[in-house]
């Protein structure tokens, strides 16, 4: 038998099981959840929304969406233009949507679900799939 095995066996027998202690975390690391920390049924927000944080900067996502009047104008432009000859205002709007991580499969979540925005959604989908990487 090798000397290292003998030393290891003696250390295990003399000092208890060191390997078993290493497998279990220390008791001071374990914490219990309080009764008021249980699962809640309320809606949770993953963003911090306090005034100090929002004083100067808006999120890219919020900045990408124009007001109702501008949105109506863009929807009208989408009705009158073809997908391969979009105006610069529509291209810029689509680029802003892309920067805000909006894509054709989740655009309906951002309020573009009405019939008046149907053509705008179609133009955005075509631009996103075919023209986004070219420009």
UniProtKB/Swiss-Prot annotation:
UniProt GO cellular component terms: extracellular region; host cell cytoplasm; host cell nucleus
Residue ranges of the region described as Disordered: 34-64
Cellular location(s): Secreted; Host nucleus; Host cytoplasm
Signal peptide per UniProt: 1-19
Primary location group: secreted
Gene disruption: observed consequences: Leads to gain of virulence on potato lines carrying defense protein R10.
Motif, RxLR-dEER: chain positions: 44-63
Record's note on what induces expression: Expression is induced during host plant infection.
Biased segments, Polar residues type: 34-43
This protein's UniProt keywords: Host cytoplasm, Host nucleus, Secreted, Signal, Virulence
Ranges annotated as biased composition (Basic and acidic residues): 46-55
Domain free text: The RxLR-dEER motif acts to carry the protein into the host cell cytoplasm through binding to cell surface phosphatidylinositol-3-phosphate.
Function in brief: Secreted effector that acts as an elicitor of hypersensitive response (HR) specifically on plants carrying defense protein R10. Enhances P.infestans colonization of Nicotiana benthamiana leaves.
Family note: Belongs to the RxLR effector family.
Designated name of the protein: RxLR effector protein Avr10
Lineage start: Eukaryota, Sar, Stramenopiles, Oomycota, Peronosporales
